[in-house]
Amino acid sequence: MGLNKDSQIGFHRSRRDRTRGYEFILEPSPVPLPLDRPQETQVLQVSCGRAHSLILTNKEGVFSMGNNSYGQCGRKVIDGEVYSESQLIHRIERFDDSVVQVVCGQDHSLFRTEKGEVYACGWGADGQTGLGHYNIACFPTKLNGDIAGVNIIQVATYGDCCLAVSDEGDLFGWGNSEYLQLASITESTQVNIPRRLPFTEVGKIKQAVCGGTNSAVLNEEGHLFVWGYGILGKGPNLLETKTPEMVPPSLFGVSEFNPDVKVSELRNGLGHFAALTNQGELFVWGKNLRGCLGIGTTDDQFFPWRVTVPGNVVDVACGVDHTVALVKSFT
């Protein structure tokens, strides 16, 4: 549900005029996929960009829908194509292996395969496709650079910067670096090919996220590191850094009486972060656009703050100006 002016969440027929579709979807609504084996195929993951969406299935690959002005849906750009009220759902192919993760950036798409390879398509003006140029790419193309031959276990993007984590815990980045996201390897504001980031001091990385102007990683010990520009989580005095700085574990509830607390999962929106602990608690910080942090105020939050919820938080997702949590009730 949500904004649908580019059919980014499918075609939903109007009840008043059956020839038209809704531009706003106000309640959860099913999206029929063009499946060959609907009884066997399940949706594994969905990712949403500015105006396009990717759907990963277990047996029939990846589907895309919405705006394809830059090739972000993995198909040829058609001049003058009208995306409003479009019923087109495209099956993306051209992969050498099964896709196991899909991630939408603002106007680009990333795909990770079972072999640990990364493919990209879409808008590339900041190098966010990682294909060695700054043009658009209409079809998924495999990335090389420093990730060539490396087993990538996770990819992350949100705006125009991209990060990738290897099975050995190394971090790679490409795309926009206007806000110091990739300043550890270059003074350029754009990087068009994956580069290894020399963040040895953070330990073995298990997860990375990147927002509009900042980034963060979580290591295997449950410690969280942040860098870039904006509200990073270490108070109002740290608004810019090109090297990762650890957010004190005590801000997530670690103490001598509770030493086993660890951050287990990390999420991000355009300007805010969310962290889940192994105790089922949710902490948030960053720009509090329209109250998206859920902390009872619309003030920005400069360090992690625990969100009060009646249960254990199982998962969380962050949008541009909203946050959704999946909670298991105490009762």
Name the predicted role of every residue range.
Residues 1-331:
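Eukaryote-biased RCC1-like beta-propeller repeat architecture
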